[in-house]
Amino acid sequence: MAPPGRRERPFSSGRFPGLLLATLVLQLSSFSDACEAPPTFEAMELIGKPKPYYKVGERVDYKCKKGYFYVPPLATHSICDRNHTWLPVSDEGCYREMCPHIRDPLNGEAILANGSYEFGSELHFICNEGYYLIGKDILYCELKDTVAVWSGKPPLCEKILCTPPPKIKNGKHTFSEVEVFEYLDAVTYSCDPAPGPDPFSLIGESMIYCGNNSTWSHAAPECKVVKCRFPVVENGKQISGFGKKFYYKATVMFECDKGYYLNGSDKIVCESNSTWDPPVPKCLKGPRPTYKPPVSNYPGYPKPDEGILDSLDDWVIALIVIVIVVAVAVICVALYRFLQGRKKKGKADGGPEYATYQTKSTPPAEQRG
């Protein structure tokens, strides 16, 4: 029994840290002898909730995710091995759900965007030339619950047809009795005889054809009288396109007499509004004026100040050459004078030595005496 006046405690403060340490050691030993969470896959998912660790020999099972189906015999489970790793397993046994095959439409073609009917794929439709698409040109393989289905019905390819082309005033077109025209069917327009002295001119395309979107290739032409005034150029003459009357697209050329120049175009055309385009030119007296824009406006031409700069460059080069020549001449003259001075100094120094030698010697006459 405890001494009187002292209460017993189930755990003393000194024993609690030791018990906590023992628990941690036990937990660490358990973790070190276990596998971590099992691997994850794109096409498979774990059956049940994952745990932070698994004991050696413990098994986990997988199933194919939504949109995938299982094809045996590949395993869909794994076991925690003694080396604390999971036995190899893969999701290669799970295949994407596939949409049903769709045939090419009549007079068209169905093209798989990625070459597969798996969900997530696209199926594109095109029609042959002369046919147009009715419906959606792209279908998507989607999941409906667990089944892969297409996003809509396949389209159809129908033949391109055109309604009869427009009728025109003072004219007609071929095949006027036909009520429906197929793709690339063509008609040709022509004008009726005119009641007056001047004929009708066909303004626009004479032949049109049934094209895409069930429309004609061009607007219907127009039949009307187009007549331009007789072109007169004073001090000039007509050199081509002669005639008494000038109708649609008539072309005339001019030249001026000697001593005159042409102001305008030498070639004019009679257009649909019965006027000449360009306007009839004029012949003006005198030589043709020359209009030379500033040379700075044309790339490749020197700027106005470039000539001055070039002449300045020539003067600078000439000045440099002159300075060099003068400097060389001065150096040569100075060197020449220096060498001449040395030569004269040498002669002056040699004279006294020769005289001294002569004075030291006894002249022959004195020796004989």
From Swiss-Prot:
Signal peptide (UniProt feature, chain positions): 1-34
Localization terms from the record: Cytoplasmic vesicle, Secretory vesicle, Acrosome inner membrane
Domain of life: Eukaryota
SMART domains: CCP
Chain positions carrying an annotated carbohydrate: 114, 163, 290
Major localisation: membrane
Membrane-crossing residue ranges in chain numbering: 315-335
Organism: Chlorocebus aethiops
Membrane-related topology note: Single-pass type I membrane protein
Protein name per UniProt: Membrane cofactor protein
Domain Sushi intervals: 35-96, 97-159, 160-225, 226-285
InterPro entries according to UniProt: CD46, SEZ6_CSMD_C4BPB_Regulators, Sushi/SCR/CCP_sf, Sushi_SCR_CCP_dom
Extracellular topological intervals: 35-314
Any one GO BP annotation for this protein: complement activation, classical pathway
